């Protein structure tokens, strides 16, 4: 039996460098990157890098050898090789000015088909839904881009159409569950086939070209090329599940490029929002709201876990109420408010929405409609207002959805300071720091106690100030009375005309008599009473001692326990253990910073309230003094 040589087996044969992979596949670096993105192959980190690199200490990009062998059988590799042949032949025809042959070659341009790759990477429909988050986020981003050097106009148009089709499905199925506004954009979460899909719609800003190439649009464009095929398959399956015609039929003037949309970016976005306010065509000719089936408790309680079943039923009832949260309400959006996220939310929960038809197309009713219940405004005041509707700020829509109920509108009126906008994506079990407003969503009594403590602290501060003022007045009055008494003593020899020496002698005689009477009483005590007193003293309860916790010893014990825990970790798990410790320390630091920020904000707010109250009291005192002076005159 031949003895195996070094690096002929084991980890050295499991990995292959990128240069060796390029040599094996006979592809350029750009084509190899494109192939890896489309097939989902990515670099790997070996456990022992020196063994994987066959003794080399240089840091190389390594792939699994089985992944590279997997790429050898991919039909796209031949298409990528055909690109080289096409480029050479078309360049030759262009050089010799053989335009007839060049036109024939352009008509035979090799196209990459990605259908089989989508089916290969996602064997089931649920697998595709699980990987839909990044797909939607990237396509929504590219749908806002204009035509760039590496991003053709056709690609951004395709992204725009596919994202609108997906939003129409979310609106028709009423599967939206959570929304949130952040600096990055608008977060949306929908529940589709039991899977939670979360994506970001970016804020709309005019595109500003970058002077430096900090973002690799070419690589991102390859991802978009794959995700468009994937989302097309997904939309087709989702639409047919709701008996909706696919592709959806929009009016002829929507989602089509003309001279205006290519030049004006605002009209480019306006057409997209107009399509969202348009009803889709169904294949079954039935326009009825789909209701979720009721849960039969009698059948489910046979499992024995009744608490879990009751919780499931409560969750289902909340979701059914959430699906019709804005049913029967009509909204009107002012021109300064971003329309796209509000149209998605309002229509997803059964409401009707419109805007100014003179500025944007697609409006269904005017501002003068008396049946409008809410008008969404983002300005401090309005010149004309209707009594029959509520004028609210946009945050009211998002907070109502997250709390799954219609909130009072008095905190969201024009010019009112808005309450904190809380994230619905907080996990109470994993996140250590939870603000008091977030806790109040689950337990409303906590916010009441928090408000009461703030009011009590303010009342205590005000009471202390009032006590100090009253104490100063009493001290002044007592000082004045003492001065008057001393003046009378000096003038008349005492308050009642009696000398002080006579009073002192009388007091001494009275004290002597009291001492004699006390001695007689002590002698009259019987022995029985003395015994009772002694027994009572023996029966007295001794005061306990407070056990003080030594924080230094507790901290030392925790550190020793942590060191012992670190020693017990196996060597192969030490990196994972250190990673967990770093994550724990980062969370603790983040929690500490959030609590510190919260304390500073609360102290600043309290100081501002105290200062305002002091100023109000000073103003009231000055007004009272001025009124008293006028009355005296």
Swiss-Prot record:
Belongs to the pescadillo family. Pfam families: BRCT_2, Pescadillo_N. Residues 454-470, 498-526 have a biased composition (Acidic residues). Residues 593-626 form a coiled coil. The keyword Nucleus applies. GO terms for molecular function: ribonucleoprotein complex binding; RNA binding. It is found in: Nucleus, Nucleolus; Nucleus, Nucleoplasm. GO terms for cellular component: nucleolus; nucleoplasm; PeBoW complex; preribosome, large subunit precursor. Required for maturation of ribosomal RNAs and formation of the large ribosomal subunit. PANTHER family: PESCADILLO - RELATED, PESCADILLO HOMOLOG. The modification Phosphoserine is found at residues 453, 457. Residues 545-554 have a biased composition (Basic residues). This is Pescadillo homolog. SMART domains: BRCT. The keyword Phosphoprotein applies. GO terms for biological process: maturation of 5.8S rRNA from tricistronic rRNA transcript (SSU-rRNA, 5.8S rRNA, LSU-rRNA); maturation of LSU-rRNA from tricistronic rRNA transcript (SSU-rRNA, 5.8S rRNA, LSU-rRNA). Residues 321-414 form the BRCT domain. Residues 450-470, 490-567 are annotated as: Disordered. InterPro entries: BRCT_dom (IPR001357), BRCT_dom_sf (IPR036420), PES (IPR010613). Keywords: Coiled coil, Nucleus, Phosphoprotein, Ribosome biogenesis, rRNA processing. Signal peptide: none annotated. Residues 527-538, 555-564 have a biased composition (Basic and acidic residues).
């Amino acid at each position: 039996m031949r003895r195996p040589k070094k690096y002929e087996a084991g980890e050295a044969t499991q990995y292959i460098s990128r240069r060796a992979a390029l040599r094996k596949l006979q592809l350029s670096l750009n084509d190899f990157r494109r192939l890896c993105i489309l097939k989902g192959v990515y670099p790997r980190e070996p456990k022992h890098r020196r063994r994987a690199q066959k003794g080399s200490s240089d840091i190389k990009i390594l792939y699994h050898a089985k992944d590279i062998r997997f790429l050898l059988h991919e039909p796209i590799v031949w298409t990528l090789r055909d690109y080289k042949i096409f480029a050479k032949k078309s360049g030759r025809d262009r050089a010799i000015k053989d335009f007839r042959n060049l036109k024939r070659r352009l008509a035979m341009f090799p196209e990459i088909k990605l259908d089989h790759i989508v089916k290969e990477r996602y064997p089931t429909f649920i697998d595709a839904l699980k990987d839909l988050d990044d797909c939607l986020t990237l396509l929504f981003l590219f749908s806002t881009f204009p035509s760039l050097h590496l991003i053709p106009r056709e690609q951004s148009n395709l992204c725009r159409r596919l994202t609108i089709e997906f939003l129409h499905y979310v609106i028709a199925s009423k599967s939206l569950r959570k929304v949130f506004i952040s600096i990055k954009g608008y977060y949306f979460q929908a529940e589709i086939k039991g899977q939670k899909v979360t994506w970001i719609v970016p804020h709309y800003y005019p595109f500003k070209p970058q002077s430096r190439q900090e973002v690799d649009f070419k690589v991102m464009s390859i991802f978009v090329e794959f995700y468009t095929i994937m989302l097309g398959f997904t939309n087709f399956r989702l639409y047919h599940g709701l008996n909706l015609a696919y592709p959806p039929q929009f009016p002829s003037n929507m989602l089509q490029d003309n001279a205006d949309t290519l030049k004006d970016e605002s009209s480019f976005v306006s057409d997209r929002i107009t399509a969202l306010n348009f009803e889709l065509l169904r294949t079954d000719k039935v326009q009825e709201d789909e209701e979720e089936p009721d849960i039969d408790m009698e059948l489910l309680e046979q499992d024995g876990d009744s608490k879990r079943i009751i919780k499931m039923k409560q969750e289902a009832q909340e979701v059914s109420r959430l699906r019709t949260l804005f049913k029967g309400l009509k909204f009107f959006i002012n021109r300064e408010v971003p329309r796209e996220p509000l149209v998605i939310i309002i229509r997803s929960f059964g409401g009707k929405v419109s805007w100014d038809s003179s500025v944007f197309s697609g409006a269904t009713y005017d501002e003068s409609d008396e049946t409008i219940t809410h008008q969404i405004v983002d300005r401090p005041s309005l010149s004309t207002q209707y009594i029959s509707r509520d004028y609210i700020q946009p945050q009211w829509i998002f907070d109502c959805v997250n709390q799954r109920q219609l909130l009072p509108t008095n905190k969201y009126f024009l010019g009112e300071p808005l309450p904190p906008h809380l994230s619905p994506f907080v996990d109470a079990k994993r996140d250590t720091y939870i603000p008091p407003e977030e806790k109040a969503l689950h337990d409303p009594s906590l916010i009441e106690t928090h408000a009461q403590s703030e009011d009590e602290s303010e009342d205590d501060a005000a009471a202390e100030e009032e006590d100090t003022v009253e104490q100063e007045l009493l001290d002044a009055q007592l000082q004045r009375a003492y001065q008057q008494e001393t003046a009378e003593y000096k003038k008349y020899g005492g308050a009642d005309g009696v000398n002080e020496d006579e009073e002192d002698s009388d007091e001494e005689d009275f004290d002597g008599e009291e001492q004699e009477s006390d001695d007689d009483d002590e002698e009259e005590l019987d022995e029985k009473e003395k015994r009772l007193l002694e027994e009572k003293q023996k029966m007295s309860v001794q005061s306990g001692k407070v056990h003080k916790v030594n924080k230094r010893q507790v901290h030392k014990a925790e550190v020793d326990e942590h060191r012992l825990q670190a020693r017990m970790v196996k060597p192969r798990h030490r990196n994972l253990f250190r990673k967990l410790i770093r994550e724990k320390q980062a969370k603790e630091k983040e929690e500490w910073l959030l609590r510190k920020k919260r304390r500073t904000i609360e102290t600043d707010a309290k100081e501002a309230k105290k200062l305002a109250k002091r100023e109000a009291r000073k103003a009231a005192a000055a007004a009272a003094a001025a009124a008293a002076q006028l009355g005296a005159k």
